[in-house]
């Protein structure tokens, strides 16, 4: 994944010093795009080991419409713990918006269900979009959505996805987001009798935290390795019925993990 290393280097070369909500400080650029051909392998960063278990369980959690960390914790995933309240709740974040978007008239919309229906019945639509940025509920969220909107595109039997991310933690967050939405693209493609085409990542405020500078330097010193392959072992009748054991990543041979503090 040379594209990702180029992204890190671009921030180092062109970024400006900025303050931020966490008080840590960043080097930041505004606007960057990366493209990954999902037919050439699964875009899982190889210059450090990615905790794939967390990627998969978080996506399954989103698809459940869940906003409490209990499901994650029960499966050994703690990536949302810092933001949860004493009851494990996070407010109306991603899962709630994907599956139960509240309308002014009191209705709720299952955006994922509507998306799949539209892909199947109107694949040339330019409205194949899911948004997590519900302005009316932002103040109730433990953390407003960083990856806030994604759009799909169907052509020649392939399904492609473009993710828009307003705030991009380049070292810790972005590799995770690339893997998560690439997996989602594969799942939706299979549910719609399509093949996964391309994943496009588009970032707004793309930043490296000051506390991640050494880790980024270490990662840039490493040579990328061949991408692994995603194997999906089962196709349930519903997008929401996948489980962790339905997925295998083969030929993933990353460099060792690089630890870094999370900016809360």
Curated annotation (Swiss-Prot):
GO terms for cellular component: cytosol. GO terms for biological process: dTMP biosynthetic process; dTTP biosynthetic process; methylation. The keyword Cytoplasm applies. Its EC number is 2.1.1.45. Gene3D superfamilies: Thymidylate synthase/dCMP hydroxymethylase domain. It catalyses: dUMP + (6R)-5,10-methylene-5,6,7,8-tetrahydrofolate = 7,8-dihydrofolate + dTMP. DUMP binds at residues 21, 126-127, 166-169, 177, 207-209. PROSITE patterns: THYMIDYLATE_SYNTHASE. It holds the Pfam family Thymidylat_synt. Signal peptide: none annotated. It is found in: Cytoplasm. This is Thymidylate synthase. The gene is thyA.
């Amino acid at each position: 994944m040379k594209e990702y290393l180029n992204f890190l280097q671009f921030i180092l070369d062109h970024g400006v010093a900025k303050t931020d909500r966490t008080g840590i400080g960043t080097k930041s650029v505004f606007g960057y795009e990366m493209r990954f051909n999902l037919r050439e392998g699964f875009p899982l960063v190889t210059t450090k080991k990615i905790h794939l278990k967390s990627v998969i369980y978080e996506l399954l959690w989103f698809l459940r419409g869940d906003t409490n960390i209990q499901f994650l914790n029960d499966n050994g995933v703690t990536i949302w713990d810092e933001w949860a309240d004493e009851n494990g709740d996070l407010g109306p974040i991603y899962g709630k918006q994907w599956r139960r978007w509240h309308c002014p008239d009191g209705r709720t919309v299952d955006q994922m269900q509507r998306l799949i229906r539209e892909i199947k019945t109107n694949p040339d639509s330019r409205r194949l979009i899911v948004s997590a940025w519900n302005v009316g509920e932002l103040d109730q969220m433990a953390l407003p959505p960083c990856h806030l909107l994604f759009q799909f595109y169907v052509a020649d039997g392939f399904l492609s996805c473009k993710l828009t991310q307003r705030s991009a933690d380049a070292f810790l967050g972005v590799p995770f987001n690339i893997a998560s939405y690439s997996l989602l693209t594969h799942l939706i493609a299979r549910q719609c009798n399509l093949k996964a085409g391309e994943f496009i990542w588009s970032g707004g405020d793309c930043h490296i935290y000051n506390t991640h500078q050494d880790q980024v330097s270490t990662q840039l010193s490493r040579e990328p390795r061949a991408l692994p392959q995603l194997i999906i072992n089962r196709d349930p009748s519903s997008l929401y019925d996948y489980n962790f054991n339905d997925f295998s990543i083969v030929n993933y041979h990353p460099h060792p993990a690089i630890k870094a503090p999370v900016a809360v």
